[in-house]
Structures are given as structure tokens and as C-alpha cells.
């Protein structure tokens, strides 16, 4: 970890030293939109989100350097509406991801950013889960951000194999951030 820049080094050949300087990946442009007043109580939320996305982007095999994503910080009412409209589930949830559909065969300008998609995170559900699971708020926010980001780049947990792969990657990214395994039994995390 480069303490000065607080960014992870690139993986593989890109992480090699060049004239004594570590080469860093181009990171996705991340816009954080606060749409629910309850998030104003968490002054550091945007910095936590940016750090989580940057760390995840530096540890995955997908090139996200020319990409953009948006993260909407909403409340339970807002995410409940999204969940009902898009998934047919009329209740709040902690995080939703909406991967952008990339048109196949459609040319785009070389300098046009690639849209990864959108993530929505619900404040009350996140806060409640963190409290119930005895996790610091910032750790749980980092985890949900990483989870949503991985969905945008194609990871899923529909099967046990997919879930295992996604959870293992989440653990590695969180460990890089100094955050304990969120899937460990609670008594081990206390």
C-alpha cells in the first residue's frame, strides 16, 4: 500500500516497479450522490466509498480505468421503491446494483467513458445491520460498496460456486483495507 496516496498497487505486470516507482491503475470515476438527509450524519461516508471502490478496482482482473459509476446514498424508503420497481420485492434492502447494459457492436468514441452502472445503498438498513452484527459502520459501508461494485463488473452469487468466488474476493479486498472477514461467525469478530 502506498501510504502517501492510499492506493493499492496494480496487480500482475502492471504492479512492477518502473525506475523505482510503483505503477498505479487508472481508477474508475466514481460519483457519490447523497439523496437522503440521514446520510449527512456520516461526514466521512464519501471518502470511505471512494477508498473501497479504488481498492477493489486495483484488485480485480477487470479493467475499470476508463469507466464511470454512480453510487446513490438513499434511505430505506428510497431503496424499497427501487427494490419493488426493479426486483418485484416490496421491502428495503441494504444495497442494490444496476449494471449498465453495454450495447454490442455499437461503436463509441475512444475517449468516451464506459458506464459500469449504479449502486444504491440504504442508510437505515446499513446502520441496523452494522449494529446487529457488531460491526463498525465504516466497515459495513466498505463491504456493501465493494459488494455492489463487484456486481457491476459481473460477479454474482446465484449459485454456491459464484457466491464462494465473490465472497472470497470481498474478503481479500476488505483485508487490504484492514477490515475483518464479514462472513466470519459473529463470536470471532467481537
Curated annotation (Swiss-Prot):
Required co-factors: Zn(2+)
Residues bound to Zn(2+): 147, 151, 157
Keyword Transferase carried by entry: no
Gene3D superfamilies cross-referenced by the UniProt entry: Metalloproteases ('zincins'), catalytic domain
UniProt region (Disordered), positions on chain: 1-20
Gene Ontology annotations of biological process type: rRNA processing
Location(s), subcellular: Cytoplasm
Keywords on record: Cytoplasm, Endonuclease, Hydrolase, Metal-binding, Nuclease, Ribosome biogenesis, rRNA processing, Zinc
GO cellular component: cytoplasm
InterPro entries: MetalPrtase_cat_dom_sf_prd, YbeY, YbeY_CS
One example GO MF annotation: zinc ion binding
Family as reported in the entry's similarity comment: Belongs to the endoribonuclease YbeY family.
Function: Single strand-specific metallo-endoribonuclease involved in late-stage 70S ribosome quality control and in maturation of the 3' terminus of the 16S rRNA.
NCBIfam families associated with the record: rRNA maturation RNase YbeY
Record's protein name: Endoribonuclease YbeY
Protein source organism: Nitrobacter hamburgensis (strain DSM 10229 / NCIMB 13809 / X14)
UniProt gene name: ybeY
Amino acid at each position: 500500500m502506498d501510504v502517501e496516496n492510499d492506493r493499492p498497487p496494480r496487480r500482475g505486470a502492471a504492479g512492477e516497479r518502473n525506475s523505482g516507482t510503483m505503477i498505479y491503475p487508472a481508477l474508475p470515476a466514481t460519483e457519490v450522490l447523497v439523496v437522503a438527509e440521514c446520510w449527512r450524519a456520516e461526514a466521512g461516508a464519501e471518502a470511505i466509498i471512494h477508498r473501497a471502490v479504488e481498492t477493489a478496482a486495483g484488485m480485480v482482473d477487470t479493467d475499470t480505468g476508463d469507466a464511470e459509476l454512480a453510487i446513490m446514498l438513499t434511505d430505506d424508503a428510497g431503496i424499497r421503491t427501487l427494490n419493488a420497481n426493479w426486483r418485484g420485492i416490496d421491502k428495503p434492502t441494504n444495497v442494490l446494483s444496476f449494471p449498465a447494459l453495454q450495447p454490442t457492436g455499437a461503436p463509441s468514441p475512444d475517449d468516451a467513458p464506459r458506464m459500469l452502472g449504479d449502486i444504491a445503498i440504504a442508510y437505515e438498513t446499513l446502520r441496523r445491520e452494522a449494529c446487529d452484527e457488531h460491526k463498525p459502520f465504516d466497515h459495513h459501508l466498505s463491504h456493501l460498496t465493494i459488494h455492489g461494485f463487484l456486481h457491476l463488473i459481473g460477479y454474482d452469487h446465484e449459485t454456491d460456486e459464484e457466491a464462494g468466488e465473490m465472497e472470497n474476493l470481498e474478503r481479500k479486498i476488505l483485508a487490504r483495507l484492514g477490515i475483518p472477514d464479514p462472513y466470519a461467525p459473529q463470536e470471532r469478530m467481537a
